[in-house]
């Protein structure tokens, strides 16, 4: 059906490694994309990011530390953080357990 995407768990793309972490593109449309990120304990992405658009992060497991515009937010399972993507941002798992989060980006940013 036009205008609908339904993707079963076993049909999703295989996550790729980015900075040693698993990053899986769940979907992409004309105006947004969904990404599943799994972080090993005490790890994160190298450097900071800044690009056009908006981001919404939903922590699914563990704790994830998001630093956005110089302010740090420690998000636990179930917490949501939204921010403009043109604010410098970085992501880190400060805990001793794995963490996972869902990010929705608008417009799509992954290549």
Regions found by a protein language model. Name each.
Residues 69-85:
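Short acidic-glycine-tyrosine-enriched beta hairpin
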């Amino acid at each position: 059906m036009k205008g609908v995407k339904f993707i079963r768990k076993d049909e999703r793309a295989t996550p790729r490694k980015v900075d040693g972490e698993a990053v899986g593109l769940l979907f992409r449309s004309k105006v947004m994309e969904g990404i599943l990120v799994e972080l090993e304990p005490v790890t994160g992405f190298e450097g900071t990011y800044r690009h056009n658009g908006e981001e919404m992060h939903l922590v699914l497991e563990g704790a994830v530390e998001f630093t956005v515009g110089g302010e740090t937010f420690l998000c636990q399972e179930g917490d949501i953080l939204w921010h403009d993507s043109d604010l410098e941002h970085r992501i880190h798992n400060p805990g001793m357990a794995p963490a996972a989060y869902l990010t929705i980006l608008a417009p799509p940013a992954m290549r």
